[in-house]
Amino acid sequence: MSSYENHRALDGLTLGKSTDYRDNYDASLLQGVPRSLNRDPLGLTADNLPFHGADIWTLYELSWLNSHGLPQIAIGHVELDYTSVNLIESKSFKLYLNSFNQTRFDTWETVRQTLERDLRACAQGNVSVKLHRLDELEGLPVAHFHGACIDDQDISIDNYQFTASYLQHAVSGEKRVEETLVSHLLKSNCLITHQPDWGSIQIQYRGRKIDREKLLRYLVSFRHHNEFHEQCVERIFNDLLRFCQPETLSVYARYTRRGGLDINPWRSNTDFVPATGRLARQ
């Protein structure tokens, strides 16, 4: 259980509660969650963050009516800056997008601007939105995380409670390496509903070599951990930085979609350009 799971800031969320679905535009459906909820326990404040990054959302179920009443569909690409006061709660995002379904908009650009304006207001930070027609994306190959996969290790695991201390003494020697490690075994649970969240994670670093067995045990220990996607990625980044002290570090997770949305947070303290193609499970 996270230390803030019962925080009063979460009381008003529609997540985990029975809700009515509206199909006429309503920006008030969007709900934010303060990033400080998980950053404060990690000792992170807005003026001392050890990373930059973004939360990348893909919107697969976005539809509205044009000025003649003809339905339009698009796939949306949203990037929410790491400095925003709030992250966007995903169920509220889904409900908000549903409210576009029977609403008329004059142009695609009006839809894009509306999304960007409302998300910025909810997040209290920078947000960019792009809309793609289906023919722009059809035929694109399934992407994959570049790097060495650490999943096929012949080890026994019987602890699935979050254990940051697995990373203690995970580096040894003075030789510096630069490598990219990948795992598809990341699984955590929604902070509120405890429903499973499945993801793949890519870790790029330069520094003393990280023990792959200890890293895998650490990642698997998220299996019963309750936090939002964005919070898990920041926790992983912070733990790796604290225990392994790499010179450079980038952590990027791509989660499977739920409710027509997928969330793909990344955090880095160096130059890093995240690949945005969907993975096999997305």
UniProtKB/Swiss-Prot annotation:
GO cellular component, one term: cytoplasm
EC number(s) per entry: 1.7.1.13
Subcellular location: Cytoplasm
SUPFAM superfamilies: Tetrahydrobiopterin biosynthesis enzymes-like
Residues given in the record as substrate binding sites: 88-90, 229-230
Family: Belongs to the GTP cyclohydrolase I family. QueF type 2 subfamily.
NCBIfam families from the UniProt entry: QueF
Its job: Catalyzes the NADPH-dependent reduction of 7-cyano-7-deazaguanine (preQ0) to 7-aminomethyl-7-deazaguanine (preQ1).
Name this polypeptide is given: NADPH-dependent 7-cyano-7-deazaguanine reductase
Protein species of origin: Salmonella arizonae (strain ATCC BAA-731 / CDC346-86 / RSK2980)
